[in-house]
């Protein structure tokens, strides 16, 4: 009998990833109105046109560092799923403690 059995931890055959999404510059998904709403929440009244690209680049570097740390926690625990606690611990490691998600 082939397959992974009940545990699902084995290597198995792999199989084809049929619906693998092509990753392009997804940072453009953070739209101009979304950035404007975040700025409004922070109390900003007028926004320069140059702010949008700068905000996207800063957000991208911040998320890359948090995700890198969260994935490191996940790999250390020998898991494949990043949990909310991994993100909480990654943020805490960077000095940005987040409350309300356990830990």
Swiss-Prot record:
Annotated organism of origin: Blastobotrys adeninivorans (Yeast)
Protein name, UniProt field: Histone H4
The organism's place on the tree of life at top rank: Eukaryota
Signal peptide region: none
SUPFAM superfamilies: Histone-fold (SSF47113)
Key words of the record: Acetylation, Chromosome, DNA-binding, Methylation, Nucleosome core, Nucleus
Annotation: DNA-binding region: 17-21
Modified residues (N6-glutaryllysine): 92
Modified residues (N6-methyllysine): 6, 9, 13
GO CC annotations on file: nucleosome; nucleus
């Amino acid at each position: 009998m082939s397959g992974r059995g009940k545990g699902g931890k084995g290597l198995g055959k792999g199989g084809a990833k049929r619906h693998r999404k092509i990753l392009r510059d997804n940072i453009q998904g953070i739209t101009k109105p979304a950035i404007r709403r975040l700025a409004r929440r922070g109390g900003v009244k007028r926004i320069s046109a140059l702010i949008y690209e700068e905000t996207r680049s800063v957000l991208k570097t911040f998320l890359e560092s948090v995700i890198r740390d969260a994935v490191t926690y996940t790999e250390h625990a020998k898991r494949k799923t990043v949990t909310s606690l991994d993100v909480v611990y990654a943020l805490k490691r960077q000095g940005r403690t987040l409350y309300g998600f356990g830990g």
